[in-house]
């Protein structure tokens, strides 16, 4: 008689684990005060959505070596207030390098989100080579790199 009751209690205790908030993958600050862009990026990560332009702000947490295969890209990792991390791939054949970039500094970025299992990738942070309007950018210490 005690076994069914224990099983119900055990299963009831596990039930909340299945009702994850959007920010469950990023437990650092699962807060309702997150920016709209942090919420959009968290949802995109959770649903494996890619291919949309987004503007967001984050903190540079790591500088990586440039990717020099094909088009050259300056690479660094940004952490959002949600705790989600994004790899930034900034095409330095089309836009100037963010040469003064330092870790622990804020950066605002407008680029295209591509899903990956580590939080996502942002690219297209440059002007459009065909001269059309649009394109992305990086704002760092008041300077726009496009």
Report each predicted region and the residues it spans.
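Positively charged n-region of N-terminal signal peptides that target proteins for export
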Residues: 1-4
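Bacterial N-terminal signal peptides
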Residues: 8-16
